[in-house]
């Protein structure tokens, strides 16, 4: 699933491609992707003649801001957007097509069909699901080690599970939680409330640095991820533990282990992470 670095990269690349384009029509080939409004015809009608003014990211969500409508899009497992000329053949698994007045098309592809799209009046999108109750952005001033300490001091959850909870800090998923914990030398099965003030400060720094570096490298292309221009990310080349089961730790040479924490496959170094 695309996490913060991948979604941020998609946002940046799409911004270069589609800002200022106006919707001339929409083709929906898989109606289940459209969640709000539930009626596909209403979805199409609301976006007709709307111009894309900006694209934002909130956690793992893309927010397409039109004249008076915001489309909240979640890529889920394998969703992707690409800009095409209308004459180009449709790629496999194309489920929603946004036809622009200049003849180009923004096409949404999704092998798994898990992605979602919601429309809301501009200004209301943060107050309702799926954005309501999301935690702080990890690149914001509000994200501090003190925030983590306060959020986790009364929980009995393991630190990996706690970090995956989008109500505390957004954008972290399986890849970057594993990587941040590795950098912080913290075992993923440690109870979150057991971390000391010093350990939490190290973890906070590891989260921010991991995400910053991943964004700089365009995210991680583990499976099918590409950005809005069809380019792969490069951060997978720097992964310390994720996807490296039985490979030597880059720090100590011990074989990386894989276990299950909170129902999620979890990679760690048994020597470096305590």
UniProtKB/Swiss-Prot annotation:
This is Formamidopyrimidine-DNA glycosylase. SUPFAM superfamilies: Glucocorticoid receptor-like (DNA-binding domain), N-terminal domain of MutM-like DNA repair proteins, S13-like H2TH domain. It holds the Pfam family Fapy_DNA_glyco. NCBIfam families: fpg, PRK01103.1. Belongs to the FPG family. A zinc finger (FPG-type) spans 240-274. Involved in base excision repair of DNA damaged by oxidation or by mutagenic agents. Acts as a DNA glycosylase that recognizes and removes damaged bases. Has a preference for oxidized purines, such as 7,8-dihydro-8-oxoguanine (8-oxoG). Has AP (apurinic/apyrimidinic) lyase activity and introduces nicks in the DNA strand. Cleaves the DNA backbone by beta-delta elimination to generate a single-strand break at the site of the removed base with both 3'- and 5'-phosphates. One of its GO terms (biological process) is base-excision repair. The keyword Hydrolase applies. GO terms for molecular function: 8-oxo-7,8-dihydroguanine DNA N-glycosylase activity; class I DNA-(apurinic or apyrimidinic site) endonuclease activity; damaged DNA binding; zinc ion binding. Signal peptide: none annotated. PROSITE patterns: FPG_CAT, ZF_FPG_1, ZF_FPG_2. Monomer. Binds 1 zinc ion per subunit. It comes from Cytobacillus firmus. HAMAP family: Fapy_DNA_glycosyl. DNA binds at residues 93, 112. The active site is at residues 2-3, 60, 264. Its EC number is 3.2.2.23, 4.2.99.18. The gene is mutM. InterPro entries: DNA_glyclase/AP_lyase_DNA-bd, DNA_glyclase_Znf_dom_DNA_BS, Formamido-pyr_DNA_Glyclase, FPG_cat, MutM-like_N-ter, Ribosomal_uS13-like_H2TH, Znf_DNA_glyclase/AP_lyase, Znf_FPG/IleRS. It catalyses: Hydrolysis of DNA containing ring-opened 7-methylguanine residues, releasing 2,6-diamino-4-hydroxy-5-(N-methyl)formamidopyrimidine; 2'-deoxyribonucleotide-(2'-deoxyribose 5'-phosphate)-2'-deoxyribonucleotide-DNA = a 3'-end 2'-deoxyribonucleotide-(2,3-dehydro-2,3-deoxyribose 5'-phosphate)-DNA + a 5'-end 5'-phospho-2'-deoxyribonucleoside-DNA + H(+). Its cofactor is Zn(2+). Keywords: DNA damage, DNA repair, DNA-binding, Glycosidase, Hydrolase, Lyase, Metal-binding, Multifunctional enzyme, Zinc, Zinc-finger.
């Amino acid at each position: 699933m695309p996490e913060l670095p991948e979604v941020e990269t998609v946002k940046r690349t799409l911004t270069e491609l589609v800002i200022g384009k106006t919707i001339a029509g929409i083709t929906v080939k898989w109606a289940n992707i459209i969640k709000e409004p539930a009626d596909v015809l209403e979805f199409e009608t609301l976006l007709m003649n709307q111009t894309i003014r900006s694209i934002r990211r909130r956690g793992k969500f893309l927010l397409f801001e039109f004249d008076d409508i915001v489309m909240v899009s979640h890529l889920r497992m394998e969703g992707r957007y690409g800009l095409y000329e209308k004459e180009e053949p449709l790629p496999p698994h194309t489920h929603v097509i946004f036809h622009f007045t200049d003849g180009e098309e923004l096409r949404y592809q999704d092998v798994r069909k898990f992605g979602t799209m919601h429309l809301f009046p501009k200004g209301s999108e943060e107050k309702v699901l799926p954005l309501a109750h999301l935690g702080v952005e990890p690149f914001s001033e509000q994200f501090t080690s003190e925030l983590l300490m306060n959020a986790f001091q009364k929980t009995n959850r393991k630190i990996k599970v706690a970090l995956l909870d989008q109500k505390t800090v957004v954008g972290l998923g399986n890849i970057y939680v594993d990587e941040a914990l590795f950098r912080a030398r913290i075992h993923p099965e440690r109870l979150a409330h057991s971390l000391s003030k010093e350990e939490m400060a190290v973890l906070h720094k590891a989260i921010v640095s991991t995400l910053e570096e991943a964004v700089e490298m365009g995210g991680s292309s583990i499976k099918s991820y590409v950005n809005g221009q069809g380019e792969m990310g490069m951060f997978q080349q720097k992964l310390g533990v994720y996807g490296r089961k039985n490979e030597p730790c880059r720090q100590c040479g011990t074989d990386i282990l894989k276990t299950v924490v909170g129902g999620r496959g979890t990679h760690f170094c048994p020597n470096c992470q305590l």
